[in-house]
Amino acid sequence: MASCDSPDAFSWLQTLPPLSQWNRNSMSMCICSPNSIHPSLNFSLTRSPHSPNTFTFSIIANFKIPISLFVSKPLRIISSNSTKFLNENVISTLLMGFVDVVLNYNAKRTTYIFQIQNLTSTSNLKDVFNLAFFTFVFLICIYEAPTSLRTTCLKTVKDQLVTCRSRQGSKLLMVQLGSNLEEQWMRSLNLAITNWIIEIKAFQHLKSPSPLFSYAFSTQGLWKVHMYCPVIAMEMESVNSALTDERLFFSLNYHQLEGVIQFNHKIYVREKWFNIAVNIDNVRCDIIRLVNETLLSERGMGEEEKHFPSRISLQLTPTVQSNILMVSVQKSSENPLREFEVEKGIEATIEPPNTFFGLKVSANETTTKSMKPWKFEESVHGYSANLTWFLHDADDGREVSSSKPSKVSMMNPRAWFKNRYSNAFRPFTKQGGVVFAGDSYGQSVLWKVDKRANGKLMEFEIKGCVWLTYWPNKHHTFYSDTRKLEFKEMLYLNLP
């Protein structure tokens, strides 16, 4: 049996002989062992006694009488002349088995087609395999493991999932899955994390995990960043009161933030410098439910009581700045036109003789102005370009992310945030997200780079913050909060 100190499923499988040469029907690897008096958690492979090329994999809680927490369906592999158990066919079979288990924990159990493409040419295959394996084990621990094992084993598995190698493996696995299955994978994982955090907070015996998952890739002319995070795991920026309504708590916390940021970039060659122009292609943020609509209605307040994006801030910075000559933005600061409407009136009345004045005069003045709910700003700090979108209160013009609604507005059925997903003037999509595209926000940020940098790989750091705010939609409550998520990724481009 492999050691529990540093579980490595891929390396352990490489040590196994072919299935036909096993001297016993079952082989096991220790995943974690809390201590000598508690049972260990094992990953086990079991050969079918009736079919020499068929096996199952399982997760076993190794009590005095072992308990199977999960057993896969029988998996058949192709016979080969390999001297080891682990070959391309076995890797593909196991990897697809792990992925299938994770996807089946998704609230939306839709049919899917998944095949591993070009497995032998996949770089960091070991990292991809171990990432899928530990994600599978992570979900089994959350949903199936007894309390005596769960806490310690979850910490062991989480520590494996947050290593640099696992982060690289996760990016490569997402490429293999494709966009649709990637979303299902992250919803399965973040549903499990949400359940775990709620359990942690209920018993207060362990610090909440850091479940943000983000990745970026750079290709010719395009940068792209994906991010996913359960709402319950986001940092609380402000809150006006304790949330005691259990149904509202359920609705607000069983959602996740899904974000996509896309930039187009182009290099213009000049006599003495390069112009690197970066412009917004798409910035998308959605708040997606993690459980089905029926459960949200029965245990919560329905799907429409959820957070909405209230501020998005992005910063792009070249990491090596010795060859940067200047940076400029193309959007001016706001100089809004304000419209005034002045109404004046005089009202005269005759008062009784014993009053000091016999005439009353009153005047009134009305001011109106028009504004869009979302305001976009560009700014520069050093060689960093900052892009920020602010949502403003349609009633008083304040920034939503840094303010709280009054109790009067919370009870007003005509307030802008009431019925916000069906209102014709909503500042969101029908589903409650936002899309900022190049048609309205296509201005470029321009860096001038010295010609001596030709042929070099330029590295840019993108740092971002997303704020989500909850103000009541249809539910009658005075509760409100704003949460924040921070992320950081690296982007690359080659200078000619």
Label each region the model flagged.
Residues 7, 17-20, 28, 33-34, ...:
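Proline-rich intrinsically disordered, low-complexity coils
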Residues 3-5, 58, 93, 275, ...:
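Short, well-ordered strand-loop elements centered on a beta-strand within folded domains, enriched
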Residues 83-84, 88-345, 373-429:
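Deployable pore-forming modules of oligomeric membrane-permeabilizing proteins
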Residues 330-383, 413, 419, 423-495:
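Membrane-insertion modules used to breach or fuse lipid bilayers
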Residues 34, 48, 119, 239, ...:
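Generic structural motif
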Residues 2-110:
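Long amphipathic alpha-helical coiled-coil/heptad-repeat bundle
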Residues 5, 15, 178, 189, ...:
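Intrinsically disordered, low-complexity regions enriched in Ser/Pro/Gly/Gln/His and often acidic
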